[in-house]
Amino acid sequence: MTNKEKLLQKIPELLNEVKSKNPLTHCITNFVTVNDCANAVLAIGASPIMSEDIEEVAEVVSIADALVINIGKLSHEQVEAMKISSAQANKINTPVILDPVGVGISQLRNKVTLEIIENYKLAAIRGNITEIKTIAKLTGIISESNTAKGVDVSESDIITQDNLNENADVISKLAAKLDTVILASGPIDILSDGETTIAIDNGDEMMPYITGSGCMLSSIVGSCIGATNPLEGTMVAALLMTIAGEKARSKVDSENAGTGSFRAYLIDYLYKLDGQTLINKSNIEIL
């Protein structure tokens, strides 16, 4: 049995662990996508709590199975809440997942991202490839990176089959240096823990046309890691999101609908997907 076959065979068990454990996922995220993140976590069988007041975050994360911190809409109070909760999570070995939304577009986002990376142990970092390459530049892995289009990926960075190996090399080196799992999401997702690197060629081109698809994925990553382990949990989360996107697009096309319906159907299929469907629909490659 190949390593790929072994990974695929574990998917139903990993997904069942998420649903049976119902991991409490503490998300400190942005007000643009908070509702979608909570519903995505619920849809896969986990439980969200969206606490960010500095007076309670240490207590909340103490009962959580994972902490997801998302810098999409920064404030001084929210950054302080992220630091307090990350410190407490590290103290009790609760996994911390970082979504460095828009890192590279401002000095504040760069500063906060580096402070989190340097001071707290992270189980995973999930971002688009421009965000991941920006972190690679900030940490000395590469010398240059493109500037993001706001919080969206730079068009010149978009992952394709032509640049897959080049991007995978950067992601693997960054994962090894930071001792964490890195997931760069896009038309092709790449994830690595520095030793094993996986490409996932699933998803749909409609996904970037709704706000929050990346934030939802990061929250799902937190839930899956909270019930399993960083590399395999991140892989299952990426498969859930991308395959739900494919199915949502098919449903939208059958109804001649648009992005509003796509957003709703995405949540529907996150709820409906099972392990065998993930195996059947997955298009993964171990690089």
Swiss-Prot record:
Residues the entry annotates as binding substrate: 50, 212
Molecular function terms from GO: ATP binding; hydroxyethylthiazole kinase activity; magnesium ion binding
GO biological-process terms attached to the record: thiamine biosynthetic process; thiamine diphosphate biosynthetic process
Record flagged with keyword Magnesium: yes
Any Pfam family hit: HK
Pathway entry: Cofactor biosynthesis; thiamine diphosphate biosynthesis; 4-methyl-5-(2-phosphoethyl)-thiazole from 5-(2-hydroxyethyl)-4-methylthiazole: step 1/1
Positions that bind ATP: 126, 185
Entry keyword Methyltransferase: no
NCBIfam families registered for this protein in UniProt: PRK09355.1 (NF006830)
Known EC number: 2.7.1.50
Protein role: Catalyzes the phosphorylation of the hydroxyl group of 4-methyl-5-beta-hydroxyethylthiazole (THZ).
Signal peptide region: none
Similarity comment text for this entry: Belongs to the Thz kinase family.
Superkingdom of origin: Archaea
Record protein name field: Hydroxyethylthiazole kinase
Keyword annotations: ATP-binding, Kinase, Magnesium, Metal-binding, Nucleotide-binding, Thiamine biosynthesis, Transferase
Cofactors: Mg(2+)
Catalytic activity line of the entry: 5-(2-hydroxyethyl)-4-methylthiazole + ATP = 4-methyl-5-(2-phosphooxyethyl)-thiazole + ADP + H(+)
SUPFAM superfamilies assigned to the protein according to its UniProt record, in alphabetical order: Ribokinase-like
